[in-house]
């Protein structure tokens, strides 16, 4: 599984904590969700389960499928449906010696929700959140 191929080498850097944020796309293989959750639960110190192109499926149902796998993997986790809030949470709880992996979006700059593509550039979101964090600005995350 590709998530395992990323998390395993990241462990070699010996981070204080490895925080893995991801979601699974809707209207795709539901069987992979539990497996990806299991991998993250086993290899990451904290899994942040979030939304990633739910398409016409319920984001909450997708996240519950992932949660089942994380629990079986013995992992600590939190579920935050809003991808922006999830990224903010992952970065806010991270320390200097942690690694935060945001998996899934890559080059995509949108969220596909109920047939509509909503603009969402994670790189810009991360830049803004880190600038706020470095400036000491604290925002409340709804989780």
Q: What does each of the following model-derived ranges do?
A:
Residues 1-143:
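ATP-dependent carboxylate-amine ligase
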């Amino acid at each position: 599984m590709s998530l395992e191929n990323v998390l395993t080498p990241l462990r070699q850097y010996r981070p204080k904590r490895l925080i893995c944020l991801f979601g699974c796309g809707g209207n795709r293989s539901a069987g992979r969700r539990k497996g990806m959750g299991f991998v993250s639960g086993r290899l990451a110190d904290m899994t942040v389960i979030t939304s990633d192109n739910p398409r016409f499926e319920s984001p909450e149902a997708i996240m519950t499928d992932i949660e089942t796998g994380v629990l079986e993997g013995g992992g600590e986790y939190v579920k935050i449906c809003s991808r922006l809030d999830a990224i903010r949470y992952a970065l806010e709880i991270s320390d200097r010696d942690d690694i935060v992996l945001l998996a899934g979006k890559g080059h995509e700059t949108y969220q596909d929700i109920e047939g509509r593509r909503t603009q969402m550039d994670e790189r810009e979101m991360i830049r803004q959140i880190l600038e706020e964090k470095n400036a000491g600005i604290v925002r409340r995350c709804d989780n």
